[in-house]
UniProtKB/Swiss-Prot annotation:
It is found in: Virion. It comes from Lactococcus phage p2 (Lactococcus lactis bacteriophage p2). This is Capsid protein. Homomultimer. It comes from the Viruses.
């Protein structure tokens, strides 16, 4: 790289970093406001931030490689942490079909670059791992509420129930036996997958690094997370690896509430949410209200029309609405399922899913030009007084 090119790269890097600081500040401003109408603006800013970050990584790697050449450093030393490792992984993915072939080819590529991995599932490039982990947290606003583990085992729920108090024993008296019930439920994990075919244009281009990167991190990861959220909230019926909050039959874990009839000046929806909050009060943790957009609007309209608020206009602000009904945060569900308003305590729904940052989560279907990402997963409500589901009459 000649000196003018080097200076141009350095200037571009400084410009991108400065832009990212500004973008993060703008995003933070919208997050404080937390208004639903600002969501498209936030998504556009986050997209630009992501594109800038990818370009920053690329330029930094080019500059680092330029610095290392005169010093005679071994370019293989930090292979697993480099951008080149990501490109090489996608090259392995495109050239090999089947999980075992991909694992063997990636193992050979790591060895070729002086990297020894003791984990039998092998380690993905660090930058891809970080991007996937970030995507898992950011692609669906509900996902953060769940307690997520990567054990890959059968989920077992043990509930010990006794309504009797401890007793005081006096000398000479016989201790009275007290009844208790221990229930054990198990859920067999299921495979949640996303099998994505590639457009003709992409086939002809043989899929560039950036397109593959975006496909895996953005689209495929998000699709899997969205499906897991739907299973946890609504779809899980005990036969598909999940027992959803909506279909949980144990009334000590999830309370089912139906709102009272609507009448002028009354707040049956808000009252039902407060009843749900009272139910989960014994359980420590942040309390979330998960609702569809139309239910959030219905709640806001009801609060504004309440007799008690006749002279006060409730702001169209999640924080203010949440404080009115006693929850810590409102999350707007963006999926397509028939979700009922749900109150859930943080980390009280347990999901176990196979780690998406392991190489055996990926498979390239060469014959049909498809890419497969999958995870073995299951989920259930973990504790008593974990949440409530509200039917709006």
């Amino acid at each position: 790289m000649n000196k003018p090119d080097l200076i141009e790269k350095q200037n571009r890097l400084a410009e991108l970093k400065e832009n990212n600081v500004s973008l993060k500040s703008q995003i933070s401003g919208f997050e404080v406001k937390n208004a639903i109408e600002d969501l498209p603006k936030v998504q556009e800013l986050e997209k630009t931030l992501s594109e800038n970050s990818i370009e920053i990584i690329k330029i930094e790697n080019e500059l680092n490689a330029q610095e290392e050449k005169p010093k005679g450093k071994d370019k293989m030393t930090n292979f697993i942490e480099s951008q080149n490792a990501v490109t090489e992984f996608f090259d392995v993915l495109k050239k090999n079909s089947g999980k075992s072939e991909i694992k063997n080819a990636w193992s050979a590529k790591l060895a070729e670059n002086g990297v020894t991995i003791t984990d039998t599932t092998f380690q993905l490039p660090r930058k891809l791992v970080e991007s996937i982990n970030t995507a898992l947290l950011n692609t669906n606003p509900v996902f953060k509420v769940f307690h997520v583990t990567n054990v890959g085992a059968l989920l077992v729920s043990r509930s010990f129930d006794s309504a009797n108090e401890a007793q005081v024993h006096k000398d000479g008296q016989t201790k009275t036996e007290q009844a208790a019930t221990l229930t054990i439920d198990t859920l067999e994990p299921v495979m949640v997958y996303k099998l994505q075919s590639l457009a003709e244009r992409v086939k002809r281009l043989q899929m560039s690094y950036s397109e593959l990167y975006n496909l895996i991190v953005a689209e495929l990861t998000q699709a899997i997370v969205n499906k897991i959220v739907d299973l946890a909230l609504v779809e899980g019926d005990g036969t598909n690896g999940f027992k959803s909050i909506d279909k949980e039959a144990d009334v000590k874990k999830i309370k089912k509430i139906t709102t009272k009839a609507k009448s002028a000046g009354k707040t049956p929806f808000a009252d039902a949410i407060e009843e749900a909050v009272d139910f989960v009060r014994p359980t420590a943790g942040r309390r979330y209200l998960i609702v569809k957009t139309e239910d959030r609007k219905a709640l806001l309209d009801e609060l504004r029309q309440a007799t008690a608020n006749a002279n006060v206009r409730i702001k169209n602000d999640d924080t203010e609405i949440a404080s009115e009904v006693g929850v810590d945060e409102i999350i707007v569900y963006t999926g397509s399922k028939a979700l009922k308003p749900t109150v859930l305590v943080d980390q009280k729904y347990h999901i176990d899913m196979q780690d998406l940052t392991k190489v055996d989560a990926f498979e390239w279907k060469t014959n049909s030009n498809m890419i497969l990402v999958e995870t073995l997963t299951s989920g259930h409500v973990e504790t008593y007084n974990a949440g409530a589901v509200i039917t709006v009459s």
